[in-house]
């Protein structure tokens, strides 16, 4: 199959409404970001981000098409005119040229939905829910975001182990009460300090949300609210997974979906972009310390 045929198949089988807006050719994020789509496809590498290392691994696996969820050259729209003198850009471009690799971004079509258990489901967050093992606990399976779950009760320690294993993380940033009992979990929209953060704060309080798994998150609004709530003895916490880290599970799930869509005519493989963060532990100190609740209530 030609790469162009594969791209067409991916677009045609997906939903056409992304976050409430029709997918339009002039405005969609989903574009061929690099390479010649008229060549025969030798293999497809699925990844959240086509990093330099992902490109190298794709070449070693014999793949000449990378399907990525995020931009290739570090900016919305993947504009490259401003990067001509950038040495990292030049090296990444040379690597793509050396191996004849195409990069196609599949963002809007994946979020618009893939066929799953009947109706269309957001391809990223259905994949996240599936690989976390939380589909039976999803309170609104057809929602994009927020995703809300009522899982069997667990401790912070148990949740940490589950997240580190499923997402294959180097560590995870934690905010809140380390003694929290977790059952009601929410994956919210990005927490960016916008006025809408007040609605999320109200929802956490009103619906008794125990735990947030966050993507983008600034250090004020909801983050500071959760810290104060935990210090006041409430059963609240945040696992700050990170935008790219969290959505990576969705791309991992997409491998099996795309392979079925193409009737296994082309090999499809997942290459993990890897944890966006590394952690340098404080020697001789607790990595996560939390004052006793009664210090704040006395």
Each language-model region and where it sits:
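Active-site catalytic microenvironments in core metabolic enzymes, especially phosphate/sugar-handling
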Residues: 1-298
């Amino acid at each position: 199959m030609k790469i162009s045929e594969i791209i067409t198949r991916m677009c045609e089988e997906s939903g056409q409404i992304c976050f409430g807006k029709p997918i339009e050719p002039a405005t969609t994020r989903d574009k061929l970001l690099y390479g010649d789509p008229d060549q025969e496809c030798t293999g497809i590498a699925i990844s959240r981000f086509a990093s330099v290392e992902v490109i190298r691994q794709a070449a070693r696996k014999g793949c000449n098409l990378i399907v990525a969820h995020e931009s290739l050259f570090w900016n919305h729209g993947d504009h490259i005119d401003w990067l001509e003198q950038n040495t990292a850009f030049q090296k990444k471009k040379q690597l793509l040229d050396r191996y004849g690799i195409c990069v196609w971004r599949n963002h809007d079509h994946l979020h618009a939905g893939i066929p799953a258990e009947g109706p269309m489901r957001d391809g990223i967050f259905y994949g996240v829910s599936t690989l976390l093992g939380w589909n039976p606990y999803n309170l609104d399976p057809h929602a994009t975001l927020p995703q809300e779950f009522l899982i069997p009760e667990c401790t912070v320690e148990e949740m940490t182990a589950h997240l580190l294993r499923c997402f294959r993380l180097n560590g995870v940033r934690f905010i809140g009460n380390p003694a929290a009992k977790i059952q009601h979990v929410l994956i919210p929209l990005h927490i960016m300090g916008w006025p809408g953060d007040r609605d999320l704060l109200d929802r956490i309080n009103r619906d008794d949300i125990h735990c947030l798994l966050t993507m983008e998150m600034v250090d004020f609004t909801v983050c500071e609210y959760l810290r104060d709530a935990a210090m006041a003895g409430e059963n609240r916490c945040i696992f700050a997974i990170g935008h790219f880290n969290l959505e990576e599970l969705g791309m991992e799930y997409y491998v099996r979906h795309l392979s079925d869509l193409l009737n296994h005519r082309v090999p499809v493989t997942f290459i993990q972009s890897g944890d966006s963060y590394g952690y340098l532990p404080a020697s001789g100190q607790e990595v996560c310390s939390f004052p006793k609740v009664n210090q704040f209530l006395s």
